[in-house]
């Protein structure tokens, strides 16, 4: 995932930051607990396509899954 793209994309619900989960190929909003899929390298930023993340397991923005 292109780091420049990650800098401009925000959660479509709360307009908050997203974190790249490389293993799951998702962009995650910890505030709304939503994960948006990345298909064929393209983020699908539709709320209807997002999945709920597990309560209490936020993506660590400083962790190894963070795209930079």
UniProtKB/Swiss-Prot annotation:
It comes from the Bacteria. Pfam families: Trm112p. GO terms for cellular component: cytosol. Belongs to the UPF0434 family. This is UPF0434 protein BTH_I0741.
